[in-house]
Amino acid sequence: MCIRDSCGEVLTEQETIPAAHRYVNGVCTVCGARDPVSAPCPGGKACPGSRFTDMPPASNWAHNAIDFTVAHKLFAGTSDTTFEPSARLTRAMIVMILYRLEGEPAAAAESAFTDVRSGAWYAGAIGWAAGSGIVNGVGGGRFDPNGLATREQTAAILYRYARFKGCDLDACGDLSAFADAGSVSAFALAPMTWAVGERLISGNAIGGRTLLDPQGVTTRAQFAMIMMRYILNVVQPAPEP
């Protein structure tokens, strides 16, 4: 179920991300949590990403999103000291991050995908996601776990996860604002429209134009931003004034 209650509630027995805070000047008046969007990073050791030598500066668009996802244990570093914001995500990595958000539940059964090896680090996550209707294969009984995740694949997986959680899927973005809207694949049209409507995905500046770039690859920094927006905009929208 998609929780929209007051600060301090949790999403499931396993999850620890509280539902809607009440922020005033960037700080929750109920529990004191810092708004990851509007409040400035405290800097120093208080910055969740302080251990990463390649952390973008606090003025960078990705900084707060990386802080948010690291603090909520959705992302780990690529090493003890690196995050690699520009590194590209694989399909298995996308599923693993959602699996962590869900609290890493036991899968009812292993997936039937022929290229998902039993015991692989992503096997449990893909088994859970496939059994929950969150992921489909790429055809021929394969999942392609090491394939790079495109932006439209990312939108489709997150859309199905939101449906699995019982979240509102009525948001309708205007894809006509993007010059390459016609290049969105049929399977991703509804998910991409939803993702734009929920402000999870915005355009990429390419060649002086703002494009959806649906076949472009999702980076770690981009997905950190998408996940922060998903949790704040979809799971726990701001209360009515």
Question: What role is predicted for each listed range?
Answer:
Residues 12-22:
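Extracellular cysteine-rich, disulfide-bonded modular repeats and adjacent stalk/linker segments
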Residues 8, 32:
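Cys/His-coordinated zinc-binding microdomains
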Residues 11, 35:
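Cys/His-rich microdomains that often coordinate metals
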Residues 37-63, 71, 76-125, 132-152, ...:
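Feature responds to low-complexity, polar/acidic, surface-exposed segments characteristic
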Residues 1-6:
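Conserved small/polar residues in nucleotide/adenosyl-binding loops
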